[in-house]
Amino acid sequence: SSTPRELAFYPNVKMEGNAFRYNPKTGKVVLSSHYEDENGYTAAKIYLAQITPKGKLEVGTMERPLGHDSRDQSLFIDDDNTAYLLSATNTNSDINIYKLDASWTKPVELVNTICKGLHRETPAIIKKDGEYYFFSSKASGWYPSQTMYTSTTDLAGEWTPIREIGNNTTFDAQFNRISKVGTTYGVWR
């Protein structure tokens, strides 16, 4: 398997679902990715690194989080600046929620496993008025699929039954991410 310095020399390495988040506690930007090496989709790792402008890339994690396979992933930052990694696991059967360390580059605790056996991917969480909302698409490769959501008041607690949102093919696309502009949230597809 590849080491952080070798990544640039492997043209077949896949880094998918790349996202960047600014960590105000460290003053660094955190990169999160689903990492696969040149052997196809067998590595199932998470790649978490941090960098500053003109600074050196510091890799925190390039492995399976706490030993679990990891495919589609995203980061959620709570109101108290605690970061969580959301990760499709068990070959996309379930979604794991991991608490990250203060640098946001290392999983330290498996908080919950949700959507068990539902084959969801492209995980995303928003928080509004004290309620957490989890959105995802059905694991269907790159084909259009139904966006669904579930909610809770405690990431480690019970979640509501999963519910549909939008039409059955997310308007001939697949749910991707959620962005917030001002006080309004928007779904990317």
Segments predicted by a language model, with ranges:
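Carbohydrate-active catalytic/glycan-binding domains of CAZyme proteins
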Residues: S1-R189
